[in-house]
């Protein structure tokens, strides 16, 4: 019996769901705003908020925990050098989810998930290489 309904499954296996949220976390950290379906945005928010809290801690163990989850060292650098210091005085609530109408084709409810005090220049077509806190390009 399917008791509880604690988490949404999105019609995917556990591994696929974990990879999907890791990829969405990477996109959100890189662009600071993404458009996705409303249920995915609602489930993504606590995942990324925990990553930002790790970025605020800033120690080696927190960095290794973040690398284990999002698997991109350049984005972990942005998380710890840019996002962590940006939200050092804020206790949670780093993200907002805004409803964005319905998708053409299947009428799925869409949402925009973004950082609260986001950098509007971070969003773009590809936004190029990831920049560190000083604005220089990271060596990959």
Swiss-Prot record:
<dbReference type="GO" id="GO:0022625">
    <property type="term" value="C:cytosolic large ribosomal subunit"/>
</dbReference>
<dbReference type="InterPro" id="IPR047859">
    <property type="entry name" value="Ribosomal_bL17_CS"/>
</dbReference>
<comment type="similarity">
    <text>Belongs to the bacterial ribosomal protein bL17 family.</text>
</comment>
<dbReference type="Pfam" id="PF01196">
    <property type="entry name" value="Ribosomal_L17"/>
</dbReference>
<comment type="subunit">
    <text>Part of the 50S ribosomal subunit. Contacts protein L32.</text>
</comment>
<protein>
    <recommendedName>
        <fullName>Large ribosomal subunit protein bL17</fullName>
    </recommendedName>
</protein>
<dbReference type="GO" id="GO:0003735">
    <property type="term" value="F:structural constituent of ribosome"/>
</dbReference>
<keyword id="KW-0687">Ribonucleoprotein</keyword>
<dbReference type="InterPro" id="IPR036373">
    <property type="entry name" value="Ribosomal_bL17_sf"/>
</dbReference>
<dbReference type="GO" id="GO:0006412">
    <property type="term" value="P:translation"/>
</dbReference>
<keyword id="KW-0689">Ribosomal protein</keyword>
<dbReference type="InterPro" id="IPR000456">
    <property type="entry name" value="Ribosomal_bL17"/>
</dbReference>
């Amino acid at each position: 019996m399917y008791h509880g309904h604690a988490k949404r499954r999105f019609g995917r296996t556990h591994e696929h769901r974990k990879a999907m949220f890791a990829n969405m976390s990477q996109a959100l950290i890189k662009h600071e705003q993404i458009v996705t379906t409303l249920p995915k945005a609602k489930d993504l928010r606590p995942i990324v908020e925990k990553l930002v809290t790790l970025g605020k801690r800033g120690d080696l163990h927190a960095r290794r925990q973040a690398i284990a989850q999002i698997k991109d060292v350049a984005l972990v650098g942005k998380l710890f050098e840019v996002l962590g210091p940006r939200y050092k005085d804020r206790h949670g609530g780093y993200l907002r989810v805004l409803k964005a109408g319905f998708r053409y084709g299947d009428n799925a409810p869409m949402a925009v998930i973004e950082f609260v005090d986001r950098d509007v220049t971070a969003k773009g077509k590809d936004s190029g290489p990831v920049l560190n806190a000083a604005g220089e390009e990271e060596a990959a």
